[in-house]
Structure formats: C-alpha cells, structure tokens
Amino acid sequence: MAKNTFQFLEVGRVDPKKLDAAERVKRSGEIYGNFDKEGAADQSERCLECGNPYCEWKCPVHNYIPNWLKLVSEGNLEQAAELAHQTNTLPEICGRVCPQDRLCEGACTLNDGFGAVTIGSVEKYITDTALDQGWRPDMSKVVATGKRVAVIGAGPAGLGCADVLVRNGVQAVVYDKNPEVGGLLTFGIPEFKLEKNVVKRRRDVLEGMGVEFVLNTDIGTDIKFEQLLEEYDAVFLGMGTYTYMKGGFPGEDKDGVYEALPYLVANNKQQLELDSPDYVDLAGQKVIVLGGGDTAMDCNRTAIRQGADSVQCAYRRDEENMPGSRREVNNAREEGVEFLWNRQPIEVVGNGKVEGIKVVTTELGEPDERGRRSPQAVPGSEEIIDADAVVIAFGFRPSPAPWFSDYGVDIDDGGRVVAPEEASEGTCAFQTTNPKIFAGGDMVRGSDLVVTAVWEGRQAAEGILDYLAV
C-alpha cells in the first residue's frame, strides 16, 4: 500500500493517554500509557521522510528515526527494534525520559503548525512491544575475540559501552557499587517517569547478550583499581557526577535544607524496599525547590506525591529560558506546583531551621557568548517566602576518584576527566591520558542527559575496539 504523503493533514499529533493529575499524584508509577499497534502506525505514518532529517541530527545518538517510523507504519516491528538498537542501547528508556521537545521532536519539520511526530512515544512502543513479544538482539554472528574490558559504573554510559563491546566479541564485566544496575536511572529518576522494572528488563537483555555485572562492589575499596588494570585489556570509567552544586548563599546548612539527589535517591530506595537512612518525608510541609532543570521537576513532583502542603519552584530566569523539559514543567504545574519565575535565592532564613527563603526579583540581561541571558537583580525587590523545607537542585559537578592521579588519569580545572571524543594521531576516541583507560558520560562532559551518556559510552567502546585492534 502506497504511503499517504498527506497523512499529517488528516491525522493530527496524538500522544498516549496521560493519567489525570488528581489520580497520578496518589501513585508512584508512570503517568503515560502506551500506543497500541494501530496508534503507533498512524502516528509514524505522519513522518514526512525528509531528505535531510533534522530530527536524526538533533538526536544525540543519531537514531535512524524516519527509517524506524516507516517500519512501524508498515507493521515491521522486529526490524524497527533491530534498527533502533543499532544506535541506542536504551531506546525504551530514552523514549520515556529524553526531553524530546528540545531534541528530535523540537527539530521535526511538522513541529511548527502541525504538531511534531510523537517520536519518543513510538520509540518507547517499539522496544517495549518487541521485548514483550520475545524479540532479543541477534548475537548469533558474534565471534569472541578473547579480549576483556572492565566497565566501572552501570549507568547509561557504562551500559552503552558494554553493549557495543559484547556485540563485537569483547567480554564486558560491569562493576557498580549499587545493588542494582542503572545508576541514576534506578536510584535518581522517580518511578513516575521511569518504572524500575523497565531497567531490570534491560539488565536481563544485556545479560542475555553476554554482559556480566558485579554489583555491590566499590572500586578502590572492595577491589583495588590496580587489580582491574592487571586482569583486563582495558578499563572504561563511567561513574557519573553526584556532587551537588551549592548556591553559595547564607543559610544553606540550616536544618530543613536538602540536596536534590540524596532526597531523590532515598525516596527511590524506600520504594524499592532498600535501606534508606537518608529518607526525607515532606508530607504536610511548605516546600520550596530551587532550580529549573529536570532534577528540580523530579523534586517538585516527588514532594507533591509525599503529601507536601504546598510546593513552589523558584528559578532565576523566566520560563522560556529554563533548561528543563517543557513537558515536565507542564506535568508539575498540573500536579499543583507553583512556579516563581525570575526569583533568585539570596538567603535561607530561620532560627537554626528553615522558616523561609529570601529571594530577589531578576531581569534578564543581554545574551552571553553561549547565547544565555544572565539574570540581573532588581534593586529593592527582596522578599521572604515562607517555607518549612528547601530542596536545592542547581545541578551536579564531577567528583573524580582520589586514585585517578595514581594511574595517570588527568582531570581538567572543573574536575572532568580528560578524554577527547575525537581520535587523533596515536590516540583513540575517549581515551584518557593513561592509554589503557577510557572514560565517558557525565564525568567527562559534566552533568547532562541520559542519551548523551549513552552516546559517549558507545563511542568510547569504539575507541576501545580501536585500541585493542579488534
């Protein structure tokens, strides 16, 4: 049957059904439903199959988006799944957590005037459905090379690296200090965005491909790094960034001020029925979350589900210039979060414990060299907003392991591991200053998206294959 070139005129953009806010705040699970076969095909057929698909370029892993949309529209699900996995280790996860409005869907030709193709939801449908029907990556033609690589960190970068290695006949052994794989996918991102059985299923898939996981193991404590260098042909570092960025204003040390990541991690661990001594319950409290990224939205929506009396989110720029996903802001707003735009915190106030936060109104100045407009304080605009708890979500900075320098792994002034993504004469992609050690993800580029970490892990694996000459 010939493609209907004007499908996008006859069929508008349709997203999977979303639970009503009043219902979803009472539960911890994902809020979006799934496409069925017909719905996914109808939405996929809206794709114009552009000659130079900007959506593909805008995607950090450069997914073959028009190609697998076409396969879905034709009912070729397994081929679509195989194609999706050629570029992405975690397509069903990226389909859930990527800010598609800033990436592929934001670049879709139909986005202006007709509504972008629902790329993320179709991506999720492809892998969820294929895996549920028994599809698995075809490893039948892989020939073992006898080479072994240790991967430190079972987050997106480490999983991406291990995936590419085993597909090329290299044994990948992934070490992680946590009791389950996924890194922040499991312990940072809340269940309402990513249910943990999805990550566990991906672990099963990777183990079926030959990836070995060694969990509850802290490198440098439980196993010396030197041992890995002796036992393996190469080592990949994908340990992420976990140290929060402080605001640098008075009162950050008061009782009732919480860091975003420990707050989220402890909440996830409690839901997973794991030991969570740092668990904080904000039920009945007036909460202010500081920040405008996706982590801030996760904190906002978690506090709502815990039963906070009120949740306000203060961000120093306006809504148009916030870094987070528009979808997540809308979800938070629907669930009862109040946004305080152009408010910059200058002090946490209270007698020993949080009683409020002093903010100043801002105006945006001229764009800097990166194109971002800097907030400027408006004189005389200070005000105090009542609060019982403050959650700081200003992002994360690298926290390099103390043993890096012992093994010739250089870091830059910002604490990031030096591992250039481009190969040069005598070096391989994502190779550190120790030729046997590679690195990728947030610890190289700084805190970023899941999908960028996947891409760097996969590219680092290609660099390792070059280094091993396999």
Question: Language-model features: where?
Answer:
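A structured beta-alpha segment of the ubiquitous adenosine-cofactor-binding alpha/beta core
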Residues: D36, G208-L229, S276-Y279, N342-D388
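Beta1-alpha1 glycine-rich phosphate/pyrophosphate-binding loop at the start
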Residues: F6-G33, H62-E74, L83-H85, D112, ...
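Local cysteine-cluster metal-coordination motifs and their immediate loop/turn environment
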Residues: E45-Y64, T89-D112
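Glycine-rich dinucleotide-binding loop and its adjacent helix/turn
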Residues: I126-V143, D204-T221, Y244-Q306, D413-C428
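A conserved FAD-binding loop/helix module that cradles the flavin
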Residues: C299, M443-V470
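FAD-site-proximal beta/loop scaffold in flavoenzymes
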Residues: D255-G284, P367-S447
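Ferredoxin-type iron-sulfur electron-transfer modules in oxidoreductases and energy-metabolism complexes
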Residues: R24-D42, Y64-R96, G113-V142, N267-N268
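Glycine-/small-residue-rich beta->alpha transition segments that form the dinucleotide
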Residues: A234, G238-M245, G293, A387-A401
